[in-house]
Amino acid sequence: KDASEADALKHALGAVLEGIAFYELAQVVSADTRVKVTFEDLGRRKAAQLAKLEALVGAQAKDSALYPSLYPLEAVSRAECYVCGYIVETKSMPNQCPKCGTARYTFEKEIALTKAWEIAAETSRKSADLFRESAGASHGRTRALLEELGKEDQALAAEAGKELAELRS
């Protein structure tokens, strides 16, 4: 693989890994069960994309991934207790607040289902563009896979748009 194809794969892997990280954290921090389920499903789709990429390049390639900052990770990486204001990392959210003793749910965020689908639509469009751009710098199986991932994310963006239209009607 030439350098441009290797870079294309690093960016594609980063986009998928960033998506997985975002959806996992968002699912943990969301208060609404419907939003949790939506983020869980979206995360599964990204995990399936990761499996396809790993089949091509190997699991160790994750170490060299370049994260493109497509997802609003900062919005879900920390959680604040709404009783006392104590802040924790979402990855290690405790079962109760270490400061005031309230239950875990005091760290959860009210994320509207429309917001979840807005994020899915926007990030899917951006990642579809990234996959297509990466495919342009690639050849053979790599190019075919990146084009496939681009189509998957374009379809997801369209699906998210339909979900949004339904929710808003």
Regions found by a protein language model. Give the residues of each.
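Non-heme di-metal
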Residues: 1-169
